[in-house]
From Swiss-Prot:
GO biological process terms held by the UniProt record: translation
Alphabetized Pfam families for the sequence: Ribosomal_L33
A GO term from the CC aspect: ribosome
Protein name: Large ribosomal subunit protein bL33
Keyword tags: Ribonucleoprotein, Ribosomal protein
Highest rank taxon of the organism: Bacteria
PANTHER family with a match to the protein in the record: 50S RIBOSOMAL PROTEIN L33, CHLOROPLASTIC (PTHR43168), LARGE RIBOSOMAL SUBUNIT PROTEIN BL33C (PTHR43168:SF2)
Length: 64
């Protein structure tokens, strides 16, 4: 009998200010990978994390 897939999925968090801000320390967009439980957190995830391109803590949103 086949085992069911788990509820945990791998997601990517992308800096929201790197996409819009031109005045930053270095070019590029910062991305983090993490996991989330699909059953408990159905909405898109938003976390404040450090962005080395902006050189400060910014909001990182979940992307597809």
């Amino acid at each position: 009998m086949a085992k069911a897939k788990g509820a945990r999925i791998i997601i990517t968090l992308e800096c929201t200010e790197c996409r819009t801000n031109v005045n930053k320390r270095s070019p590029g967009v910062n991305r983090y990978t993490t996991t989330k439980n699909r059953r408990n957190t159905t909405a898109r995830l938003e976390l404040k994390k450090f962005c080395p391109h902006c050189n400060r803590h910014t909001v990182h949103k979940e992307i597809k």
